Amino acid sequence: MTSPNILLTRIDNRLVHGQVGVTWTSTIGANLLVVVDDVVANDDIQQKLMGITAETYGFGIRFFTIEKTINVIGKAAPHQKIFLICRTPQTVRKLVEGGIDLKDVNVGNMHFSEGKKQISSKVYVDDQDLTDLRFIKQRGVNVFIQDVPGDQKEQIPD
């Protein structure tokens, strides 16, 4: 089994939206968006809504649970240029623990909620988020905060 061609993994609690569909996908040259989310993988309505973005901009889209991603991503065809989208750092950590080789993890949007502190203009984290991001980074993955491709990359605080 060959390694899948994962161009980028993004943490964005909005998952698929116009910014992901237009800016990120075209900038990195992806032709397949894989949404890794246990809830969305079983929600036809959310899949249809996100699928509209994919259809509009001409790239493929799949919706997988964490477990299915771990089990099938290695079977991706070489021509598939994959952009993984996850809602939380916990999801990405589970992918790494499951043996998926990630090179770059972009933290895009993590909205404010009670108990979270701001670490950049659009990223709010709690202690568990930071623990998971540091775990991912300690596994040799390049983890950075960047809203859109033209913005300067910021590092996760140690």
Curated annotation (Swiss-Prot):
GO terms for molecular function: kinase activity; protein-N(PI)-phosphohistidine-sugar phosphotransferase activity. GO terms for cellular component: cytoplasm. Residues 1-158 form the PTS EIIB type-4 domain. The keyword Transmembrane does not apply. Keywords: Cytoplasm, Kinase, Phosphotransferase system, Sugar transport, Transferase, Transport. GO terms for biological process: phosphoenolpyruvate-dependent sugar phosphotransferase system. InterPro entries: PTS_IIB_sorbose-sp, PTS_IIB_sorbose-sp_sf, PTS_IIB_sorbose-sp_subgr. It is found in: Cytoplasm. Its main location: cytoplasm. The phosphoenolpyruvate-dependent sugar phosphotransferase system (sugar PTS), a major carbohydrate active -transport system, catalyzes the phosphorylation of incoming sugar substrates concomitantly with their translocation across the cell membrane. This system is involved in N-acetylgalactosamine transport. This is N-acetylgalactosamine-specific phosphotransferase enzyme IIB component 1. It comes from Escherichia coli (strain K12). The gene is agaB.
